[in-house]
Amino acid sequence: MRQSLRTKAIRAVGMKQQTATPNHSISVQLRVYALALLLATFISALHAGILFGLADILMLFRDWAKGALGARPTDVLVVIGAISGLFMTHIAEAAMWAAFFWKSGHMASFADGWYFAGVSHTTLGYGDIVLPKPWRSLGPISAINGLLTFGCSTAFLFLILQVIWQHPL
């Protein structure tokens, strides 16, 4: 029987060849991927809702605080509030991915799931922790979700700054 060049190289180095484990049937894989896509959709929708709510809160605060604090301190606090709200939102989103990776059995602990989710969600991609072979595509799903939410956050923060610059108190 002919061996592939990759198999020969793996045996020569003494590495184990990673293959899909038999207990991960196609139906199980499809369910996990469907759950990941649902989670990505949920996180994106939640993110949009939080942005709308945060915008309302920040503009109400701006209108309320302008008389008490003055224009410049109020605007600085609005920007700080926007950045803080976005930061907490992204932390919560990474925690949702971490819980998914941990509870679905893809990570040994929540801490490992948290680290992997943070690295994937921010598209940092160190690669020091990876998912087993049949599940590797879950990382890019998390990364795409992170790109979309971080893009929305960037646009939101720019919009807040634009409102402050174009409509001074």
Predicted regions mapped to residue ranges:
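Single-residue recognition of alpha-helix boundary sites
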Residues: 58, 104, 136-139
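Pore domain of cation channels
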Residues: 39-43, 47, 112-122, 126-169
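Hydrophobic positions within alpha-helical membrane elements
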Residues: 52, 95-98, 130, 151
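Generic alpha-helical scaffold signal
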Residues: 48, 74, 78, 90-94, ...
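Cytoplasmic (intracellular) domains, linkers, and terminal tails of multi-pass ion channels
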Residues: 1-87, 150-169
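Outer-pore turret/helix-boundary of cation channels
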Residues: 89-116
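Generic detection of intrinsically disordered/low-complexity segments and helix-coil linkers/edges
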Residues: 27, 108-110, 120
